[in-house]
Amino acid sequence: MGTHRDVRFVSSGVKLPCADAAPAPAPAPTLLSAALPFARIGRAIDGVVRHVARSLPRLPVARAETGAGAAAAPIALPRRQKDGGGGGGGEERVLISEVAVRGKDGEPLERPELEAAAAAALRACRPNAALTVREVQEDVHRVVESGLFRSCMPVAVDTRDGIRLVFEVEPNQDFHGLVCEGANMLPSKFLEDAFHDRHGKIINIRHLDQVIKSVNGWYQERGLTGLVSYAEILSGGILRLQVSEAEVNNINIRFLDRRTGEPTVGKTQPETILRHLTTKKGQAYNRAQVKRDVETILTMGIMEDVTIIPQPVGDSNKVDLVMNLVERPSGGFSAGGGISSGITNGPLSGLIGSFAYSHRNVFGRNKKLNLSLERGQIDSIFRLNYTDPWIDGDNKRTSRTIMVQNSRTPGTLIHGGDHPDHGPITIGRVTAGIEYSRPFRPKWSGTLGLIFQHAGARDDKGNPIIRDFYNSQLTASGNAYDDTLLAKLESVYTDSGDRSSTMFVFNIEQGLPILPEWLSFNRVTARLRQGYEIGPARLLLSASGGHVEGNFSPHEAFAIGGTNSVRGYEEGAVGSGRSYAVGSGEVSCRMFGPLEGVVFGDYGSDLSSGPKVPGDPAGARGKPGSGYGYGVGIRVDSPLGPLRLEYAFNDKQARRFHFGVGYRN
């Protein structure tokens, strides 16, 4: 509960109580039917206007007091000539010898500054001026519209020196507190700041009107449906504001047919949709929040179209939200292709064909099942993934992925290319694991996993081998296969999805030697990418690095060089080590349509750690350990991501084309 002097904020709004003040709240009007505050002031002014119209032009008899209204009975005046000018439009004018401002009892005001403020508001009414009823009416309006007075009564008094026009004003009360009801979303500090210097001063209707506009603007800027629906001054100088906020009454889900648009029975469980919404029953209706909820449902990948329509509930300030959903087909088969990360010589050896089956809404609960097979001349990958994007009963949006994979990939990244007397080496891996991921800050997410891997090298006939042509060992244990149980911890930061944003990935893997023959090592990697907009161009800087400590398989060393590393070199041709560092910079510019031109430069090094890899595969093959490349390229946007074609030179003046799909790692 926030406090400020004698300001006290309560749960349903704000309250600045006055000592011994007991306001009698009036029923609040509805959100849409409420008028601006102090409508009674307008009615009072109209009454004054009618009184002035009756009094000034006629022949009165005497002056009398009539209580709080302080109405004046005019005295006799001589007949006046009609105004022949354009200003009065034919109205009779009365010559005024003196103009004064007094309190409603006819006595001078206690505060001279109030008398000066009322006098300053007068425009037409000046001493020795011939006035019409219209001009007096306009000055009455000006005095009241100054915001300091609750009433203003013009009184004409016949004196020895002529007609004396007295404006009898009633100032507003001094401000001693504020009661604000219904402001559940409005921060208490907002009104504290608006009234912090007004305590003990005359309530100014102009200032109050500005506060009301700022409150309404606060709701509008944040996409909230809310406004000040009523305002009044209570006894004791207490201001009462009634705020009406649209409240969510119910959220109803309606599935529509993809073809006809008619209501149909959906496959998705309603609770699966509702748990993804940040808008809840009983909350204030927030248009921006509802828009984000629509985007969230679309990112689930199971809906083709989502709309949320608010509908008013009777005469209340509540709304029902109707969510119209069009479901996508739940699953199906697909086929495609790609390029191996371990491209070898030959026109077709780097190409991969793929076949997959996916079901994106298992059990109608947004669970994902993917079964894929990739096959190339050398590569072969069978993968089974089952993902629960949001575990039931968890309120932190934790996801779970279960994975099983059997793969055979080229060993050329670490163990070089073919030799006349020795065929290509492939690395076979059988992997199974489970991972849990969740966001833990607005732009941060984390992953914790446990993965088991059974991996080893094979010759061109598929037979297990433990040494290559250079007599370098291919496994860390000396057996045909290395077994590893990895505990994985990963943290990812990204501030947006575009390429001109910041991304940081930090990963730790620890081998757990539960059995004596299982490998024990620690691997740490990090990647950083930062983009900048420079006029029509875009600068992208990236860096990555890592280190392995312990007993690990040679084929798990860091490979440097290639399309996603140092361009201008073949895959893994710069080196392979226990440690590595790679930096890259590129400037891209849109040429026309989806075509983009790129200029780039890369540098990578194994930080002199190549000989520390078991068997020293980089030293046996004469890899330099460091190198750089530069070149130009073009990119074309496609449904699969950017298609990259690049032509690069390395520091050995060798030239090489690189082709890739998607953004560089």
Swiss-Prot record:
Its primary localisation, in coarse terms, equals plastid
Query: Which cell locations does it reside in?
Result: Plastid, Chloroplast outer membrane
Record bears the keyword Lipid biosynthesis: no
Enumerate the UniProt keywords alphabetically.
Chloroplast, Membrane, Plastid, Plastid outer membrane
Note the InterPro entries from the entry.
Bac_surfAg_D15, BamA/TamA_POTRA, D15-like, POTRA
Q: Name one GO cellular component term.
A: chloroplast outer membrane
Location of the POTRA domain: 246-328
Q: What Gene Ontology biological process does one annotation of this record name?
A: chloroplast organization
Other comment: Probably not processed upon targeting to chloroplasts.
Alphabetical list of PANTHER family matching this protein: OUTER ENVELOPE PROTEIN 80, CHLOROPLASTIC, SORTING AND ASSEMBLY MACHINERY SAMM50 PROTEIN FAMILY MEMBER
Protein family: Belongs to the OEP80 (TC 1.B.33.2) family.
The name this protein carries in UniProt is Outer envelope protein 80, chloroplastic
The organism is Oryza sativa subsp. indica
